[in-house]
Curated annotation (Swiss-Prot):
This is Probable pre-mRNA-splicing factor ATP-dependent RNA helicase DEAH5. Keywords: ATP-binding, Helicase, Hydrolase, mRNA processing, mRNA splicing, Nucleotide-binding, Nucleus, Phosphoprotein, Spliceosome. Gene3D superfamilies: 1.20.120.1080, Nucleic acid-binding proteins, P-loop containing nucleotide triphosphate hydrolases. May be involved in pre-mRNA splicing. One of its GO terms (cellular component) is mitochondrion. It catalyses: ATP + H2O = ADP + phosphate + H(+). Residues 706-886 form the Helicase C-terminal domain. A motif (DEAH box) lies at residues 635-638. SMART domains: DEXDc, HA2, HELICc, S1. It comes from Arabidopsis thaliana (Mouse-ear cress). ATP binds at residues 538-545. Belongs to the DEAD box helicase family. DEAH subfamily. PRP22 sub-subfamily. Its EC number is 3.6.4.13. Residues 81-172, 180-206 have a biased composition (Basic and acidic residues).
Length: 1168
């Protein structure tokens, strides 16, 4: 009966929502119409089917509105599920691209081929190095000969001045002899070598009197600069060209002066001719023999060989060749264009310009398109860019026919158990309240800055200032000068001497013996010996992570190999390894070490290795049998990260091949049965925790503003409950900072008679010395409140917590395969997480947990366990890694919780567009190289494309800077000054080049820490970027990939970015902001971007961040032609004879009188 009533309420709620949507979009909200649409939606499985049914019923609606309606309807009435058997059969037939046969042999052949290529490049590099040494030796000989000739000339002059004829005859004879000796001194070998060189130099065909494109000529260096050198042709008197520093050698040359010097003889190749300017290359020519290393010829118009040759000429006459990244490289002039190309003006723009000129607002000669030689009218520049219309290339690859987004409806992951429940409404409301609070803070900041007097010198100039005026001016002068001026609550929390970890009076051995696991040491070792796979369950703080590895090392398991322990977080792997090294009695990096992405702190003696789960996955990629290890321990398995889930499947297979390998799976929650059932029904080893009873308290009514409710609860506990510390769970840094500020102000408002409350935040961006404060016990008579993210659920153990405040929310990364976007969404936690949070209050003594939601919401709106990461995030990196292991049959892979087939198809579609997969869905050579880099596939492609485009040095820096996160520090009290400092680094090309400018400026200041402090830049982030860059550089060196600089040619850099992130393209919307090219989604440039004031027509962004709007992060200006040029599988030029899809969806705003209402021009509809 209750279920029927609940269904009726859900139906009424759905009808109300549909009516509201219809009112908003169509201006009509009839209940009967809403009921009819809901019925159509209940019987439609896909968006296309729903759209078809609506059209048959006579309803024409926009695509986005149809999709929104169906999502709302399916939230209450999901499509009827088919039986499991039919579903599996259907998946095999429907998603054939996921059931390709495994090809491990082909992948191994690819690896050998890549190694052979690297070895060939290594040998070539050695040959070039030897040749450079020989050439430098010849240069020294040539200089010595020139000096000797100069001395002889001076000697001749002295003899000539004597003036006797006899001496003249003798001198004449001597000159002949000396000339003979000089010739002999040069040597017959030298002459033979010179003749051999000349054989390779192209002879003058038809008596050409000017240098020709792609021909090799001998020349002499006339002028040397840092950025390059000028070379004069020996053959053409008075003709010279520029050799840019990037074209001097295959290796990196920082300054031209280090490689060439004046009057040095060189061989050059003409790579570009512009008017009378010649761009030359030395690296394409063997300087020892004059041979062209990369021969390119000028094909005739009738030549059809471009189809079969790797290098060919495009329609506009540019020669291209295919690089290692699969893109066509256009041979361009290295000199940056002198000005931006003009965009073709539309008719309204020309009319507007003429009106401005006619009215006298704009001077005609200042207008860029003014015709000086003509009649003074505006002209359209020849060759001005036509407006390019680009659309998606909907051609599906053979292995994905009928499976991509163009054929199958890809719905987003359902993360809310009940989308209409109280928790869902509270999550949505909190996002709006956060936006409101942020805007209020910004308004207060602006008001404060506006109140500062503009002329602060007046009080000193005034001989009789008002009382206190000079003092006020002195204070105002200091506003904005201190870079890291913390708010009051942070000063109280962290302003004193920092501490570095939890202090204990016990010795290390006594601390180890006090852990609950110590009593079960013998039983645990025996259980590992008797079971190949063992699931270990124990509360956080029981000693699983730090002690199990040491017990096994003491039991002799390190004699057969290493003991590896994975952690889901980088920080955990580092801190745990440091602690275990102290207990083990060694230095970190010796017997005990750790490995995280871009950092390896291990050595040849390492026997206990802590690492992130992603690092172990990369080790399996190299050695599928993990032959170095005797024991693998998957710690914190209950967090179910994407790497852990893939490791489950790979290790399950490996256990059958390696019977000597031991696998331990640990978890802090009570979902052990699921793990045990997955791993061959293995035994479960339980460590009893030292927990006390916890009283659970629910709210009687749902809380709309959970943040405010949490603060009220904290104050209530502080004022009415016995002593004991408080732990509050919130969703992120912004929420935590806002809560701490508000709580501090409320405590100040209560007066000095109230006991002090120490407020301590915890989130990942906080420095470690500040995080460690939470472990210190508060002074007598005081209480501390720790405001933390869900990192305090299981990863941290804080003693002294008696009270837990749980609003019931966390932020989760959710991927939408239809839009191809990831976003951080506030979602209700699972019941397992709620139990875990409550358990934090029972570590020291009996405690209380205040759940800020109803018991009904706990039972009906929270899922039993969290949705695994593999079912809600982008699977591009995971799919590429599995393909690199030869695993193509992803449907049959033994996942504990299989991901959505649509998400896997979306990932494979992305990899195909990047060139990592071929037409059959198998890994390409480019894909295997991409898998070598510990980067997301787009970043890997961007790096490999930069090698071809000749800008890998800059792209390495950019990727390293992006990987470290936000490098700019913007304190709330000094936002204006921080923004001003940041603006100094802005580049007109975009944010990627701004990051490059920051790193180069830091490098120019010798990596100075004080310089970072002055410019509001986080020095820790820059040092991290430096380490990341070194790691990527070592991988580049391993495969002998060229690291070259593009100098000032930013076009190459922007092209490389486009080659990796073409699907993150956006175009300026005529009405407001931008529209993404893939889903036509409205997005905006963030106010902190270098391009915020410029608003270019076409951009590429790194990712999207949802705050008050959907903002693009790290934005760069692009040319739309590059999208088709660099991603022909993804984009194509629209058919000029047809109206494009974008133009069909574009809304045209009619002109209207600005002094009246926009719709006042419309005629009223006549009534019949």
């Amino acid at each position: 009966m209750e279920k029927e009533e609940l269904n009726k309420l859900n139906h009424l709620s759905l009808v109300s929502n549909v009516c509201n949507e219809l009112e908003t979009h169509l201006g009509s909200a009839e209940k009967v119409l809403a009921e009819f649409i809901i019925d159509l939606g209940r019987h439609s499985e896909t968006v296309d089917e729903f759209d078809k049914n609506l059209k048959e019923a006579g309803a024409e609606m926009p695509d986005y509105f149809v999709r929104s309606l169906l999502t709302t309807i399916h939230g209450i009435y999901p499509p009827k599920p088919k039986s499991e058997k039919k579903k599996e059969e259907g998946d095999d037939q429907k998603f054939k691209g996921l059931a390709i046969k495994d090809t491990k042999d082909k992948v191994k052949e690819l690896e050998k081929e890549i190694e052979r290529e690297a070895e060939e490049r290594r040998r070539e590099e050695d040959r070039n190095r030897d040749r450079d040494r020989r050439e430098s030796g010849r240069d020294r000989d040539r200089d010595r000969n020139r000096d000797r000739d100069d001395r002889r000339d001076r000697h001749r002059d002295r003899e000539r001045n004597r003036g006797d004829e006899e001496g003249e005859d003798r001198r004449s004879d001597r000159r002949h002899r000396e000339r003979g000796r000089g010739d002999g001194g040069e040597g017959e070998d030298r002459r033979r070598d010179r003749r051999a060189k000349d054989e390779y130099v192209e002879e003058d065909k038809g008596g050409a009197n000017e240098p020709e494109l792609y021909q090799v000529y001998k020349g002499r260096v006339t002028r040397v600069m840092d950025a390059g050198c000028f070379v004069q042709f020996d053959k053409f008197r008075g003709k010279e060209g520029l050799v840019h520093v990037s074209q001097m050698a295959t290796r990196r040359v920082d300054k031209a002066k280090e490689f060439v010097k004046r009057d040095m003889e060189v061989y050059v190749k003409v790579i570009s001719i512009s008017s009378d300017k010649y761009s030359l290359s030395m690296r394409d020519v063997d300087q020892n023999t004059g041979r062209d290393l990369i021969p390119l010829r000028k094909p005739s118009d009738e030549d059809d060989s471009s189809r079969s040759n790797p290098s060919y000429r495009t329609k506009d006459g540019q020669v291209t060749k295919t690089g290692i990244s699969g893109i066509r490289i256009v041979e361009e002039n290295d000199v940056a264009p002198s000005r931006r190309p003009l965009k073709k003006m539309s008719s309204p723009e020309r009319w507007e310009a003429k009106q401005l000129i006619a009215s006298g607002v704009l001077r005609v000669d200042e207008f860029p398109m003014y015709d000086e030689d003509g009649d003074g009218m505006l002209y359209q520049e020849e060759g001005a860019e036509e407006e390019l219309e680009i659309e998606m290339n909907e051609d599906e690859p053979a292995f994905l026919q009928g499976q991509t987004r163009y054929s199958v409806d890809m719905s987003p992951v359902k993360i809310f158990k009940n989308p209409e429940g109280s928790l869902s409404r509270a999550a949505a409301l909190q996002s709006a309240l956060t936006k409101e609070r942020r805007e209020m803070r910004e308004q207060q900041q602006r008001t404060m800055l506006d109140s500062i007097p503009k002329d602060l010198n007046r009080p000193w100039e005034d001989p009789m200032p008002e009382t206190g005026e000079r003092h006020l001016a002195q204070e105002l002068r200091g506003v904005g000068l201190s870079a890291y001026d913390m708010p009051e609550w942070k000063k109280d929390a962290f302003g004193k001497t920092p501490t570095f970890g939890q202090r204990s009076k016990l010795s290390i051995q006594e601390q180890r013996e006090s852990l609950p696991i110590y009593k079960l040491k013998k039983e645990l070792i025996q259980a590992v010996h008797d079971n190949q796979v063992l699931v270990v369950i124990g509360e956080t703080g029981s000693g699983k992570t730090t002690q199990v590895t040491q017990y096994l090392a003491e039991a002799g398991y390190t004699t057969k190999g290493k003991i590896g322990c994975t952690q889901p977080r980088r920080v955990a792997a580092m801190s745990v390894a440091k602690r275990v090294a102290e207990e083990f009695g060694c230095r970190l990096g010796e017997e005990v070490g750790y490995a995280i992405r871009f950092e390896d702190c291990t050595g040849p003696d390492t026997v206990i290795k802590y690492m992130t789960d992603g690092m172990l996955l990369r080790e399996i990629l190299i050695d599928e049998n993990l032959s170095q290890y005797s024991v693998i321990m998957l710690d914190e398995a209950h967090e179910r990260t994407i790497h852990t889930d893939v490791l489950f499947g790979l290790l399950k297979k490996l256990m059958k091949r390696r019977l000597d390998l031991r696998l331990i799976v640990t978890s802090a929650t009570l979902d052990a049965e699921k793990f045990s059932g997955y791993f061959f029904n293995c035994n479960i080893f339980t460590i009893p925790g030292r927990t006390f009873p916890v009283e659970i308290l629910y709210t009687k009514q749902p809380e709309t503003d959970y943040l405010d409710a949490a603060l009220i609860t904290v104050l209530q506990i502080h004022l009415t409950e016995p002593e004991g510390d408080i732990l509050v769970f919130l969703t992120g840094q912004e929420e935590i900072d806002s809560a701490c500020q508000s709580l501090y102000e409320r405590m100040k408002g209560l007066g000095k008679n109230v006991p002090e409350l120490i407020i301590l935040p915890v989130y990942s961006a906080l420095p470690s010395e500040m995080q460690s404060r939470i472990f210190d016990p508060p002074p007598p008579g005081k209480r501390k409140v720790v405001v933390a993210t869900n990192i305090a659920e299981a990863s941290l153990t804080i003693d002294g917590i008696y009270y837990v405040v749980d609003p019931g929310f966390a932020k989760q990364n959710v991927y939408n395969p239809k839009q191809g976007l990831e976003s951080l969404v506030i979602t209700p936690i699972s019941q397992a997480s709620a139990k875990q949070r409550a358990g934090r209050a029972g570590r020291t003594g009996p405690g209380k947990c205040y759940r800020l939601y109803t018991e009904s919401a706990y039972r009906n709106e929270m899922p039993p366990t969290s949705i695994p990461e593999i079912q809600r995030i982008n699977l591009g990196m995971t799919t590429l890694t599995m393909k690199a292991m030869g695993i193509n049959d992803l449907l049959s892979f033994d996942f504990m919780d299989p991901p959505q087939p649509q998400a896997l198809i979306s990932a494979m579609e992305q990899l195909y567009s990047l060139g990592a997969l071929d037409e059959e869905g198998l890994l390409t050579k480019l894909g295997r190289k991409m898998a070598e880099f510990p980067l997301e596939p787009p970043l890997s492609k961007m790096l490999l494309a930069s090698v071809d485009l000749g800008c890998s040095d800059e792209i390495l820096t950019m990727i390293a800077m992006i990987q470290t996160g936000n490098i700019f520090y913007r304190p709330r009290e000094k936002q204006a000054q921080a923004d001003q400092k940041r603006a100094k680094f802005f580049q007109p090309e975009g944010d990627h080049l701004t990051l490059l400018a920051v790193y180069e400026a830091w490098k120019a200041k010798n990596f100075s820490g004080p310089w970072c402090f002055e410019n509001f830049i986080q020095s820790r982030s820059l040092r991290r970027a430096q380490d990341v860059r070194k790691q990527l550089l070592s991988i580049m060196d391993k495969y002998k990939l060229d690291v070259v600089t593009a100098g000032k040619n930013f076009t190459k850099i922007r092209k490389a970015i486009t080659a990796g992130f073409f699907f993150h393209g956006a175009r300026k919307d005529p009405q407001e902001g931008y529209r993404t090219l893939v889903e036509n989604q409205p997005v905006y440039i963030h106010p902190s971007s270098a391009l915020f004031q410029r608003q270019p027509d076409w951009v590429i962004y790194h990712d999207l961040v949802m705050t008050t709007k959907e903002y693009m992060r790290e934005v760069t200006v692009i040319d739309p032609k590059w999208l088709v040029e660099l991603a022909p599988r993804f984009f194509k030029v629209s058919d000029p004879t047809k109206m494009s899809k974008r133009k069909r969806q574009e809304r045209i705003e009619p002109l209207y009188d600005r002094y009246h209402e926009p719709n006042s021009w419309r005629l009223s509809k006549r009534r019949a």
